[in-house]
Amino acid sequence: MKKKKLIPCIIAIVAIVLLGIAGVKLYQLMFGGAVKVQTADIISAIAQMKLQLIIGAVILIAGIVILIIGLRKKDENLKDLLKVQGIVAMVLAVVITVNTVCFGPQYSNLSTVLSGTTAISEEHINESLEAAEAIADEGITLLKNEGNALPLASGTKLNVFGWSSVAPVYGGAGSGSSDSSKAASLLDGLHEAGFETNTELENFYTNFRSERPSISFFGVDFTIPEPTMEEFQNANIFENAKAFSDTALVVIGRSSGEGSDLAMNLSDDNNFTIGENGEHVTFSTQEDDLDAEKSYLELSNREIAMLDEVTKDFKDVIVVINSAQPMELGWLDQYDNIKGAIYCPSPGQVGFRSLGKILSGEVNPSGHLVDTFVYDLHAIPTINNFGSFHYTDYEDVTGSADNIVPFVNYNEGIYVGYKFYETAAEEGLIDYDEVVQYPFGYGLSYTSFDAEIADTQDDGQKITLTVNVKNTGDVAGKYVPQIYFNPPYTDGGIEKATANLIGYEKTELLEPGESEAVTFEIAYEDMASYDSNKIKSADGAYVLEAGDYQINLCSDSHHVLDTYTATVDTDRIYDDAHDGKRSSDEQTATNHLDYAKGNVTYLSRAGHFANYEESIAGPTDFTMPEEAKENYASVVTFDASKYDDADAQMPTTGANNGLKFQDMAGVDYDDEKWDSLLDQLTIDELKELAGNGTFHVVATSSINLPYIYETDGPTAVNSFFTGKFGTAFPAPIMVASTWSKELAGRFRTCIGNELCDFGFTGWYGPGMNIHRNAFSGRNFEYYSEDGYLSGCVAVAEIAAVRKLGIIPYMKHFVLNDSETDRARGICTWSTEQAIREIYLKPFEMAIKEADANGIMNSKNSIGSRWIGSNADVQNLSLIHISEPTRH
């Protein structure tokens, strides 16, 4: 009898366990350990399924109650009936809950999980691997080569120092990450190139620590693993290494990722919140590396001790910098025995093979820097206005001190990266050689080149330059002629930098003595500056001021090789009151973002940067401006009634016009047929299209729109939800470092083919934000500190995937140039000139030149106005760029 009573209880327990297993299996199916699910995600998912879970729980509890009641009944027939009903109720609870969840709130996610095919074709895999290696061949940058120490002789024995040699950085974390499980390691690359490495040293490092500390959504650990000198000495590492070889290769690595900016000091104190959820930051688990005077982008104390010993014991030392962020590298010139240095950021699946080939001389390096490398990162103009700052009086609006509003000031204005350093040197503010170690665009080669302007044609609207490049060295190589313009400047007038990249190309592989003619076309209007302060225009406009424009052929942003001077006789003001819009614009560009300026003091060239100290100082006023309080979008203060319009007319919905989405291919933007199609949408469909769009576009029956599958990311096909991962390409920063538009296009053609193989139509990329600060966590995922270079790479990439029918969602639009507080509606203050000339520039170029048809918004506010509902940013500031095109 007791056994009979146990059976229903066992069944009830089994039902509950099965429901739990179903949930776990669903989680594994959807995420497979690949996606980093946050607490907020779980809470959101539960909230979506609340109704279904409540119904299931009620039925399950009812079943359990019925079983318990049945156990107490003496009538056997009634007992059996209640047992059956209880079991049926519990089974129904499982079936109903799972089905209503799968076909209700989680339908879109499940559809995404089960989408497409599961494999990339062999042909496309091979094409991708070849392209990835070509990118690394041309993206790795030679920084130093004293006495032609490189390339190394074939068969050289190498002592490879630095813990990062056994755990190098292949890419970054987050949406821009990639699957490096099949990657060729750094040591693999050396071995394939014919080098023999010290296996004792390799084993020593591997035994010290096998995994790289995580910088990700779940935690931030800035530990820089490296053994102590005592551990080196106890293992007799240096003595044995000297017996193995007199040549040392030192690898210094730094990682980064989405959700976290990098530590500006390695102290015990968490001086600002880093990460999406404010996770605690571990600065180092190695106490002797904790140093409040040092940042994550400097050598750690243990690394210095290791380098001291290595440079003492080995006469030829080569350094590899494996970091997507510019590091402080002054020490490269402080050790006499460091003869060579190579910059190798995030090389991906096969990029370390390229490193081996460059070290051996099989490949001549032709990469160039996309950022300026300075000696002191704590002295850059943005350093005091990067991090977490909060207004102290938002509780006046919400009534609660728990509701905070973060903000950041883009205090440097247009003087970002090299534009500051080149201009500051010209104005006498800095001694360039004391501040800058490696200029923007810098890169050495194993050969030498001569470049000169051979011919110039100038019709007053366009300048055509012919540049002759000749290989004057002994080995074949590629060269990048760079064109910068230096515009006329009036003290106190429109802000202008002395160096502005406006053209670059990469030559073919030139044999010794071989020459190539490279042609550049420069439109005068592209040298216009945006007059957001309304100095020469009533409403703001692009202005090409009268005067001499120096068109400089350069090897990098600082070294001028040849110059052509173009003269503009009178101001050209591109507004309706003067000379009309620029020819590349669809409508005249005027100010729409005056409110974004706020109450910030911005860096100005006036008086030789007279306000430098004031403008670069950190915030001193943490009071939220009254206008900002009125406009700031917050769930705490949101009032839907503010959007009520008594005169609003309900649009037509649910019309039966007989149109299908497929009928609209090639239909002109202004064709009324679009209105007829949109009239067919129902209210429910409109809500679904607007509110249910993560990694997909929902199927919409009224217009026959199919379900569209979408995925990350900027570096590789990176589908967290489906577990579908493509080739791990070098990160976008290395793609940009090739300075090759052809390779950028080839890169995205390969990713586009992989997207098609997997069945994806939408692609969350490319990442086009700016390297405003070296400590930004996602610099690996973005191209450069320069808007024009970023735009050129983006144009090549977007044009390539558009040809394959892929929708590229260029991101993150706009001013998403750090990770700190990015998801908290951070108020971002900047001048409209800087926004247009630098941060919007890549987006503008992509729309104009590559017919870009997708944008992913950032989560911040421009000024105090949330970008998601900011019509000025979404429409008005872009509408001048190009005639809108529906796709």
Where are these regions (language model features)?
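Glycoside hydrolase catalytic-domain context in secreted enzymes
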Residues: M1-N552, D556-S557, G580, S584-S882, ...
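Short beta-strand elements
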Residues: H559-D579
